[in-house]
Amino acid sequence: MTKAEKVNFVIDTLENIYPEVPIPLDHKDPYTLLIAVLLSAQCTDVRVNQITPLLFAKADNPYDMIKLTQEEIKEIIRPCGLSPMKSKGIYELSHILIDKHQGEVPANFVDLEELPAVGHKTASVVMSQAFNIPAFPVDTHIHRLMYRWGLSNGTTVQQTEKDAKRLFPEEKWNKLHLQIIWYGREYCQARGWKLDNDIITKTIGRKAAINEYLKNQKK
């Protein structure tokens, strides 16, 4: 199978499995999505979705958020981990949104990535899921799957993102990155992975990844 055929197989298979694909983080607008994505660093989406209703009940916009102290924010988000850094980021970026952006989340990478605690991946998620602007946020699931499928040799998420953008049509990026995340969680996990359930890796997977799996099964 050529690389182009592999890419088409991935697109078609994921479209069959996930014709409708949910956004993992609960939110109602760009601001609440931005905060949820910030909280998701080194934390599960399930945990974030348990904590954000508690935070957003007190403040679901930057104007209300800056009425809270950093300490109050930190106590609410503590179960998400890294709460000192995240609470500082939430408080400071809320101030900047008010001071520089009329309280609105900017719909461009430059302004987003200038916000405290907002890196390229967070900005990409907001651009894609809040504003429907083509982006391809790469998380650990996408990084792992692109390697297993032989579509990227990237040792960093930055390189994997470049490969994904080069291989997949731009008009499919926003949906496809979500489809790959869900597929990684349900069929191609880092641990407890069962090749028989993983039609994509079984069909187009990197030989080294498949051989490693088979070797581990014999132990």
Where are these predicted regions, by residue range?
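Catalytic cores of DNA base-excision repair glycosylases
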Residues: 2-218
